[in-house]
Amino acid sequence: EEGEFVTVIGTNGAGKSTFLNTIAGTIRVDSGKISLNGIDVTKKTAHQRAHWVARVFQDPMAGTCEGLTIEENMALAYKRGESRFLKGSLNAKNRELFREKLSILKLNLENRLTDRMGLLSGGQRQAVSLLMASLQPSKILLLDEHTAALDPKTAAFVLELTDRIVSENNLTTM
């Protein structure tokens, strides 16, 4: 149901990440059908599914491009599910939107749009990844143990941020 938070529980190697990868389209299924909001997406690629699926990975270094700036990463996320050309996305209107969104993190990143993503700590990158996942509406947000690589204090911050973003956007989350 829309807005529900579903938790998948299992031991290491049980297939939790594989399950999320099949939903995202990065792994093809051998049989069965995957439907998102009543639409059969089984044969659609990960890029085609990106219109409906947002994702935050376990590894804070995944899901962002360390060689690109914060604003370039956010511009790519803003174009999720579309052809991704940075040039048209890096304009004053979008920069203001990115600053506004980043300000909710209270990490002063709204003043560092031109810094390379690789300069951020793991916790900062994970917070930005979560924010990037919510820039465009999606039908489902996949969180693959997105706090596992973080220290306890940062993990608590990212979980609080997750709750806020999921609630504000009424996201269905796994």
Where are the model-predicted features located?
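Catalytic Walker B motif of ABC-type/P-loop ATPase nucleotide-binding domains
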Residues: L141-E145
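Q-loop/switch helix immediately C-terminal to the Walker
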Residues: G67-S83
